[in-house]
Curated annotation (Swiss-Prot):
Subunit description: Homodimer.
Record-linked InterPro entries: Hist_DNA-bd, Histone-like_DNA-bd_CS, IHF-like_DNA-bd_dom_sf
Summary of the function given for this chain in its UniProt record: Histone-like DNA-binding protein which is capable of wrapping DNA to stabilize it, and thus to prevent its denaturation under extreme environmental conditions.
Pfam families referenced in this protein's UniProt entry, alphabetically: Bac_DNA_binding (PF00216)
Protein name as annotated: DNA-binding protein HU
Family as reported in the entry's similarity comment: Belongs to the bacterial histone-like protein family.
GO molecular function: DNA binding; structural constituent of chromatin
Length: 99
């Protein structure tokens, strides 16, 4: 499911969800909400903060040290620079929903 399909799914799910505070959600509002969540997670991760959404999962940043590697084409040794790797760990509720 791509982003556009997910936004359509959000609006449909809102209309059928008995727990939703509002029974109407336009695609424009759903897109704004989704973009806000994505932008907020990215901003928090860039600021070196972990984002824990209980039951859903956590977004974290892991620092990877510089290391020596090989160019797969030539086999020549090269140094792979240190970098920060964003990671996602699924929460219990999400794991249970998948099984």
């Amino acid at each position: 499911m791509n982003k556009t399909e997910f936004i359509a799914y959000m609006t449909e799910h809102c209309h059928n969800n008995k727990h939703a505070a509002h029974k109407t959600l336009t695609k424009a509002d759903a897109e704004k909400a989704l973009n806000l969540v994505i932008d907020s997670v990215i901003s928090a991760i860039k600021s070196k903060h972990n984002v824990n959404l209980t039951g859903f999962g956590s977004f974290e940043i892991h620092h990877r040290k510089a290391r020596e590697g090989r160019n797969p084409k030539t086999g020549a040794k090269m140094t792979i620079d240190a970098y920060n790797q964003p990671t996602f760990r699924a929460g219990r509720k999400l794991k249970e929903a998948c099984n």
